[in-house]
Amino acid sequence: MDKISGFSDDELLVKILSFLPFKFAITTSVLSKQWKFLWMRVPKLEYDEDSMYSFEYSFRYFLPKVKEVDSETYSIVSESGHRMRSFIEKNLPLHSSPVIESLRLKFFTEVFQPEDIKLWVEIAVSRCAQELSVDFFPKEKHNALLPRNLYTCKSLVTLKLRNNILVDVPHVFSLPSLKILHLERVTYGDGESLQRLLSNCSVLEDLVVELDTGDNVRKLDVIIPSLLSLSFGMSRYCAYEGYRIDTPSLKYFKLTDLSKTFSGLIENMPKLEEANITARHNFKKLLELVTSVKRLSLNIENNDAE
């Protein structure tokens, strides 16, 4: 028996839908009664305001029919945001896939609130989420606090957080399956939250950390034997005391250090194959720290540019 014949008709259709962008999977509900709720079983979910406001791809659940963008665009966008929020509120708790393999959220208008992000992430985690990606960038700059159950999610393999997210790591937590962690310009609950998180990710392979003004991080040790790829960035206005990197398995390293003084210590990268370094100072010292690299890209920032 081949693999396809092992599926029921509905299971096969759901499998096919899972390969479509989620917004297109939703639109199939208008095809027939059989298709009406099939998208509710797709295990990969994505709600993206950027996609929603591309009028040529608008779906009747979210947007009214608009032939051209005019002076009423803002009110249309606001109304559409409310439609999308209501749609998620109604359907996400009822999503019938037993496992939500991935949930991707990207919101930037005032329609979406921090409490929404927290609730929707909590629902995904309760369904054994394997991938979570949240980009939250509202005008009011309120941070979304992640639910506590996230920090004990045994199934989570990929976690990507960006912008107005508050990462408040408890003292006791467990993410035993986490291999990919991207933290870009988020805020941390205290000066030790990021350090606690990195110190207890024993199988982490891919790490992206972008530090920015007001994120509460002052110093950081990246000591992760399993790490293969590291992208580490600091803005020029970071109030930062220093960092230490000890990653014996690392193969790819990207460093963007725009801080005013170099205060880094790179100790152990014997397997490094490629490095991409952007900095404002102490290039000679940085080069001495990555002597084993096979491919090196350098970008010298102007110290006078503010």
Regions found by a protein language model. Name each.
Residues 166, 214, 235, 255-260, ...:
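Hydrophobic lipid-interacting interfaces of membrane-associated proteins
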Residues 118-123, 147-154, 170-178, 194-203, ...:
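A structural signal for leucine-rich repeat
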Residues 35, 274-306:
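C-terminal amphipathic alpha-helical segment
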Residues 45, 272-273:
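A broad, low-specificity signal marking well-ordered, structured residues that form hydrophobic/aromatic
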Residues 2-223:
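Leucine-rich repeat
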